[in-house]
Amino acid sequence: MSVIKMTDLELAGKRVFIRADLNVPVKDGKVTSDARILASLPTIKLCLEAGAKVMVTSHLGRPTEGEYNEEFSLAPVVNYLNDALDCDVKLAKDYLDGLELNAGELVVLENVRFNKGEKKNEEALSKKYAALCDIFVMDAFGTAHRAQASTHGVGMNAPIACAGPLLAAELEALGKAMDNPARPLVAIVGGSKVSTKLTVLESLSKIADQLVVGGGIANTFIAAQGHNVGKSLYEADLVETAKKLMVECAIPVATDVACAKAFDENAEAEIKNVADVQDDDMIFDLGPDSTAVLADIIKNAKTILWNGPVGVFEFKNFEAGTAGISKAIADSEGFSVAGGGDTLAAIDKFGIKADVSYISTGGGAFLEFVEGKVLPAVAMLEERAKA
């Protein structure tokens, strides 16, 4: 994967347009979770320290396109940046016809979704963005799977288009895990439904040495082995697909599970052999034997790709499976990449952040990359690197 990297460019005096992911939760005009801003700060600081004229923008929420709506303004982000940086950060509302900036100055361009034509990647808007800059920096992996004016079109028209440090690190980590992985490669796919992760499972079954399934997905595989799954969430219409995947790839299926009679955080966990699951049982987690077997597989892996918890880890009585998998990943000496919202919540809950080699910032983009799909923003950067 060959792209121009921002860190290889001379930025002094240049007008630099950074497309970041500053789509943060806001309540009462205050940023309530700053993780995405913190992730973008090093890129912004590098540009400022290099003496660039810096513009940074993002989407925030889902406003009606083409209409200003204060509820979705980037103003709270600007307030946050003013506190975090040693410079005066301004918010520009009307910027499409040009901006005057000085070297070492930072301006936040208002929510790109206030501009008509953003989502449809319209050429006229893309060219207006491009006219603002000498260098376009794509640094929002979380939106790299969308071809929009601020993620794709601008890069096709800007004098130079490059990958920011965040995006470059993401592509490097995912490439290391998928393109030429140290083996054995173990992929862990959790979540509630096979249908939503089917293309991920099919893609990983072709490259993984072992594919670990968990959550509601695992129930469909248990059913595919002819076992009763009671009232558990599973997809009867995908049992044949599960059987096919088990032929194509080594998929260790649970031998024991944690059940309850109702979906309730106070429900007692009953550990059962899969052959003993009753019609009124609901499977909510892996049992201790299955967790131990999978933990051994993970500990011996050279590369680990993790997307999704293996049980209802939000409930104290059904967290043991995901806790065991998390510990195995933390203890493994292999290279590990984790991504997806629920996965990040599990990493936080079990305190293994420092032990995961790379944590992906992109939800949908992470999944599409793992599915083997071409991400439009990345394809654009590769094309521009050839020019």
Curated annotation (Swiss-Prot):
Transmembrane stretches, start-end: none
Residues holding ATP: 197, 314, 340-343
Gene3D superfamilies (UniProt xref): Phosphoglycerate kinase, N-terminal domain (3.40.50.1260)
One annotated Gene Ontology cellular component of this protein: cytosol
Residues engaged in binding substrate: 21-23, 36, 59-62, 113, 146
Subcellular location: Cytoplasm
GO molecular function: ADP binding; ATP binding; phosphoglycerate kinase activity
EC number: 2.7.2.3
Family label: Belongs to the phosphoglycerate kinase family.
Subunit composition and interactions: Monomer.
Name used for this protein in its record: Phosphoglycerate kinase
Organism listed in the record: Aliivibrio salmonicida (strain LFI1238)
Gene name tied to this protein: pgk
